[in-house]
Design a protein with these regions (language model features):
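Hydrophobic, aromatic-rich transmembrane alpha-helices
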Residues: 295, 300-321, 477
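Interfacial juxtamembrane loops and adjacent helix segments
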Residues: 37-100, 243-285
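Short helix- or helix-capping micro-motifs
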Residues: 128-133, 160, 181, 185
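Signature aromatic-anchored transmembrane alpha helix within multi-pass, membrane-resident enzymes
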Residues: 1, 225-230, 313-332, 359, ...
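C-terminal luminal/periplasmic domains and tails of membrane-associated envelope-modifying transferases
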Residues: 405-731
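Membrane-interface transmembrane helices that cradle and orient dolichyl/undecaprenyl
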Residues: 117-119, 158-174
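Short hydrophobic alpha-helices at membrane interfaces in multi-pass membrane enzymes
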Residues: 129, 166-182, 214, 330-331
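Transmembrane alpha-helix segments characteristic
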Residues: 179, 307-310, 319-339, 383, ...
Length: 731
């Protein structure tokens, strides 16, 4: 048990927030703090609730219930605000929450050991323990704040106690089976599958003198169901009310659970074909019936597969298929459910099958007498098995979630087979930062498959189109997939194969598929250094509005020996002069020089003003000229929306006394190069009641995400704006 917990605990410190962790932690913690289950939508709150227990004693944690996302029950945005934007120590919170999941994992290991001893024998118990403590899928999910491990534990416990009831008809066993079935349903909506397992086991398990009769089996299903309902009702604070898909006069216990169970089923059906998934080299919006069969073949350790197969063959040979149906029925049922092609996004959905496969494999220890009758042979066999398991899992440690067996080939081939949570779940930002530091990489262009904030882990980056965090915005639309700008790129395996999981973006990163990574972060993020031969010429087209991946390469001026550094504009209110070519405003008699350098990100060269004065009610029209500097725009955490904007204010002396203001920026930073000049047209509406006199014009640069302004040096001091001139308001 200590070996298992150590592997999970040690590797947990090396992992950033995986894709779903922030959702479950936010929902569970908010439930504990407020008793409100409004965030328990896509999943019931039990898993997150258990994980959040270690956080209750921490009075420094801020729960932002005053944010609009809480009022709107928006778990996606609220979890972002909670973890990354409320001043909370996100990684520390996650590590403490993961302790509880690891504790559940240890309980699962112990349960498998004792179940094997009870069902099969002492030798089987020890073999099951050996197989379990080095099972990479169980180790991986025993240190993520998600629903998969709790669901696996509770389904296993429910099935085990149900088997005990069928073999030794004691009503408390049926009651316990029902309680654990209720916990499985409280952990995840598909926990309802446990009832199919229990019902089929009751039908197949032979009746014995000491076991439950047919009549008792039927009655016990009702008892177990009532126990499960009691668990769910307790979890939802004994609430009673109507649901939308039934008559309003019919109240139900735990209506929130029932309603969202129904909504989730409808949503899964509606989402079929709505996003692109990946399987065996094919990115498609269709599903594959054999997805989980292949996934099991490459994601489970070969020894585990081999022993499970031998175990099943021996069950058939010994005519024990019905007597020990509990060993093979749950995996078979889960695989058949997977063949319905409902959800092809990760082998983790088969995690509840693994404990039963381990029992099936462990049964071999009781059925091969020549191996177990002599202590010396037993010791040698155990030693060889242990060595095999240790060496196998050591190949990927501490990256257990990315485990593939030897059938999958070297790690470079794994993303050709499966991606998403099979390999890449957003968990390797810590590794990415360390790889960047080790290789002296200052910043990367990042295509990240995950919901964590890369900035929170010290990753310096510019966002590329990615599911789900970076799906839109000018920086995303400005990505040139045909000849990306030179520099370092960090591409998640899922993004490499599926883009942003929409049909039109599947090949966003096709150019990188034929390149060998310079380095990797874990097994999920690949680093490439992109450079072009010195003889390559550069086209510098200007594109307004259209996402670059929707345009053919020829439209961007790309040819075999010519790449494109595209200047992307959101509207026609701005103009770009690539490398300053064609910029002649300084020769205009109305040009007013400024030369204010904002942190070497942008320099305000000056502006033109063709209006000598303006009257109240009129619009003052200016054109500002900015030149791109050597430094990138600082990125706050998390990156959401525009990275940069500029302001122009008309003020009456004090900068806080604004009479008119302009805040906007049209150009994407991606594709801009040092020396590019951007001409931005500015319109300032002067109100009717403005008194005639001279007013100051101020300009500056800021981040719309955290409202931080860049500073500029003036007369030996630094300011977050520059006075560019004055405007005369006349009667």
């Amino acid at each position: 048990l200590l070996i298992f917990a150590t592997q999970a605990g040690w590797s947990s410190t090396r992992k950033s927030a995986a894709f779903d962790e922030q959702y479950h932690l936010a929902a569970g913690y908010s439930y504990l703090r407020t008793g409100d289950f409004r965030l328990a939508t896509n999943h019931p709150p039990l898993a997150g609730l258990l994980a959040a227990l270690p956080l209750l004693a921490d009075s420094t944690i801020t729960l932002p219930t005053d944010h609009s996302s809480w009022q709107n029950s928006d778990r996606f945005l609220f979890s972002d605000i909670f973890l990354w934007e409320s001043g909370n120590a996100a990684q520390s919170m996650l590590l403490r929450a993961r302790w509880m999941v690891t504790a559940l994992g240890v309980l699962l290991v112990a349960s498998i050991f004792f179940a094997a001893r009870q069902m099969l024998g002492v030798r089987a118990g020890w073999l099951a323990l050996l197989l379990t403590i080095f099972e990479p899928n169980l180790i991986a999910h025993s240190r993520f704040v998600t629903t998969d491990l709790p669901l696996t534990l509770f389904i296993f416990l429910a099935t085990w106690w149900w088997w005990r009831w069928l073999v030794h008809a004691r009503w408390r066993y049926a009651m316990l089976a029902g309680l654990f079935a209720g916990l499985a349903m409280g952990a995840k909506y598909n926990g309802a599958l446990v009832w199919a397992i229990l019902a089929l086991t009751a039908l197949l398990q032979p009746i014995t003198p000491a076991g439950a009769s047919w009549k008792q089996r039927l009655a016990s299903m009702i008892v177990a169901a009532l126990a499960a309902v009691a668990v769910i009702w307790t979890l939802f604070r004994f609430s009673v009310g109507p649901v939308t898909f039934l008559p309003a006069w019919l109240p139900l216990p735990a209506p929130h659970y029932v309603q969202w169970f129904w909504n989730t089923v409808v949503r899964i059906i509606d989402l079929q074909g709505a996003r692109v998934d990946f399987f065996l080299g094919e990115a498609s919006s269709r599903s594959w019936w054999n997805y989980f069969f292949v996934a099991a073949g490459v994601k489970l350790p070969l020894l585990e597969l081999l022993l499970a197969l031998i175990g099943f063959v021996l069950l058939v040979r010994d005519r024990s298929v019905r007597r020990l149906c509990v060993l093979w029925l749950p995996p078979a049922l889960l695989l058949l459910l997977g063949a319905t092609q409902v959800l092809n996004i990760g082998f983790r959905h088969m995690l509840p099958a693994i404990p039963f496969l381990l029992l099936l494999g462990a049964s071999v220890a009781e059925r091969v007498p020549w191996l177990t009758t002599r202590p010396r042979r037993t010791a040698i066999a155990a030693g060889l098995l242990a060595l095999w398991l240790v060496l196998d899992v050591a190949r990927v440690a501490p990256h257990y979630e990315s485990y593939f067996n030897q059938l999958a080939g070297p790690w470079q081939n794994w993303s050709n087979l499966l991606v998403d949570s099979n390999l890449d779940w957003g968990q390797d930002l810590i590794e990415l930062r360390q790889v960047m530091d080790a290789n002296g990489i200052e910043s990367v262009n990042l295509a990240y498959f995950g919901k964590a904030a890369p900035e929170a882990y010290g990753v310096r980056y510019q966002p590329l189109p990615s599911y789900l965090r970076f799906m839109e915005g000018r920086e995303i639309y400005a990505y040139n997939p045909y000849t990306p700008m030179p520099g370092w790129y960090a591409i998640s395996a899922t993004a490499l194969r599926t883009g942003t999981m929409t049909p039109e973006t599947v090949d966003l990163y096709k150019v990188f598929r034929d390149l060998a990574p310079e380095a990797r972060a874990g097994f999920s993020i690949y680093l490439y250094h992109l450079a072009y031969p010195p003889t390559t010429t550069v086209a510098r087209p200007i594109v307004t509005g259209a996402a670059l991946w929707t345009l053919p390469p020829a439209a961007l001026g790309i040819a075999p020996d010519r790449r494109a550094a595209v200047k992307w504009l959101e509207t026609s209110a701005s103009t770009v002069y690539p490398q300053g070519a064609g910029f002649t405003a300084t020769r205009d008699e109305n040009f007013q020089p400024v030369a204010a350098n904002f942190a070497d990100v942008l320099t305000l060269l000056g502006y033109t003003n063709n209006m000598q004065s303006v009257k109240p009610g009129e619009t003052l029209a200016l054109t500002l000229y900015w030149q791109v500097g050597e430094q990138p725009m600082p990125q706050p955490a998390p990156t959401r929306g525009a990275a940069l904007s500029i302001f122009v204010h008309v003020v009456d002396g004090d900068p806080a006394r604004k009479l008119a203001e302009f805040d906007s920026w049209d150009a994407a930073l991606r594709g801009l190069e040092p020396g590019d000049v951007i001409a931005q047209h500015v319109a300032l509406e002067i109100a009717e009641d403005v008194a005639p006199k001279a007013y100051d014009l101020l300009a500056g640069v800021y981040s719309p995400q955290d409202w931080q302004r860049l500073v500029t040096a003036q007369d030996g001091a630094t300011y977050d704006y520059v006075r560019i001139g004055a405007v005369e308001v006349t009667p």
